[in-house]
């Protein structure tokens, strides 16, 4: 696996990990919070024999540029990064794989209907309409998503500074996985990246720029416009891989998922949580491999 820092036409420089034959079908894999391309560290070797894998650190994460303005993390800007990355690598058409926030951008690209995206694979990342509806109607999901309200608090950086990045690492991953199973190298790398000037604010700005309404538990709120407006059906093939033990994104996110497109398959993973790409890389690879090959 090699790494490059690519200047993009969107004005940032993006760190990208690359592996697989350059003449193979291209797949862009988008990570989520609070990670980097390292999300795919155990999955990539299982897919790279017949696929060209492109694994960026999305803006604000890892070794990519970290704009400090909240507006720099609007969905349209993040989508522009995706297509600018493909342009920088000379990739015309590609499949998308997204986890967590990376899935949010992958969903957005598919909903937009850009013809460059040939197929979509999602790993534990909710469709925006289903997610917003669940935040209004499902008290369990609303309670599980209160961390989003915390991340939007302008004083959250001070909170993390107070507890330290070691404790933040434990809070971020500890409720999802056994911390003892995370390699020491991964822990030290993430903490070093988060400790850089402006890194934490850049990551949190993904939540602050989001228009997703996250009400406090137990209160009644008006139905957001996101729920009321019509969403176009996704025309390309979609495969949703879901760790059913996800404590942040509950199984309610799978309700109605088959209605969001014309060709949607769901692969539930029992005993697997939110960080499925490195909790169960073999199972995720088994679900991805035939799909990304067009089968």
Residue ranges and their predicted role:
Residues 38-41, 201, 251, 286:
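Alpha-helical elements of the RecA-like P-loop NTPase motor core of helicases
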Residues 82, 284, 288, 292:
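Hydrophobic "lid"/C-terminal helical patch
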